[in-house]
Amino acid sequence: MGNALNLRVRRTLTIVAVALISCIFVGNARAVEPAHTLLILGDSITWGANYKGFGNVTPKLQALNTFDTVIVDGAFSRNISGPAKTLENGVKTYAKYLKTKVRPSAVIVALGSNDLQGSIKVRYYEDRIRELLTLIGDIPVVWVNVSRIDSQYYIRASPVFNKVLNRVALDYPNVSVVDWHTMISANPKWFAFDKLHLQPVGYRARATLYVELAQNLWNVVVPITTTTTTTTIVAATTIPG
């Protein structure tokens, strides 16, 4: 009788031990946070903000010690979508990242200036903005609006694009718009001689803006992950009880 009881006790303890080990393994596996990637997708203004002699923004972003990976991708003449002088527009560039398994946790979009050529077409702007936002999906996005003063046409076109951007962003809860147009209008000396690109002081200001936006985006990304992970761990560790 005693031997049978001891055998049952040993079997019960073995089952409990296995359950505890399994629970701890699952809990720890789920507790590992995924790597977070920030992508800044822009044109020549972003290139200048990242150039070592101007804004040098990449090391400043890394110094935040927030996102595990920071990608600053700025290319001359890049537009949002459609034909471009540069090799890849914004949509194609983002699709390329997805194809190579780069999955950004948050995105700063700084495009639109090179989509103003031709004529002022509200539907044209809207279609391209929506195309990129749809591709990006539901991760946090900040879009920096545009400002060009290199001709009367661009002075008129920039606010139209920005108005369309503001309206479209309302349809995407994960998207916010930053008003670069107002910032640089208050600091016209940031513009270079061509009234399109920037002086070094302007690129430094743009880099500072990117750093601020990156910190804000991190504060959005982290609570989502932390809340989910905490809930999962609590649920897992309460199973044995």
Language-model features and meaning:
Residues 20-21, 28-31, 59, 63-82, ...:
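Extracellular/periplasmic envelope-modification machinery, especially enzymes
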Residues 1-41, 45-52, 64-66, 100-105, ...:
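N-terminal secretory targeting modules
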Residues 109-111, 142-145:
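Conserved beta-strand segments of the P-loop GTPase G domain that flank and frequently precede/overlap
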